Amino acid sequence: MLWLQGGPGGSSLFGLFIEHGPFFVNASLSITERTIAWSKKYNMIYVDQPAGTGFSFTDDANGYATNQYEVARDLYEALAQFYTLFPELLDNDFFVTGESYGGLFVCLYFKLLKHS
């Protein structure tokens, strides 16, 4: 399952550590295992996107998306690279979800996927 945070420009680390990842950051800023986590049922992929969000970056200024369609294209290319590195996961069911503005990128990603 691919998780896309809202924003735009919201780091998916928020979803990972605050909402539904296997661990959460508690009030004393230590990490605690979450008893109910999506990762107990699904293999999770948390992506900081577009480039420049969270820990995502590029050394080339031309690598930054200038519109939502470029963001979807970059995500498509990132996932293609992911599956090149981990082909054993290709047979797994694949879900894409997100919240707030991340939901827009979910729709754009599938539109791109449909036409590719």
Give the location of each predicted region.
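Short, intrinsically disordered, charge-balanced linker/junction segments flanking boundaries
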Residues: 97, 104, 115-116
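Short helix immediately C-terminal to the catalytic nucleophile in hydrolase catalytic domains
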Residues: 102, 106-110
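Alpha/beta-hydrolase fold nucleophile elbow
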Residues: 87-101
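N-terminal cap/lid subdomain of alpha/beta-hydrolase-fold enzymes
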Residues: 1-73, 80, 84, 109-115
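Catalytic nucleophile-elbow at a beta strand-turn-alpha helix junction centered on a G-D-S/GDSL motif
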Residues: 48, 100-103
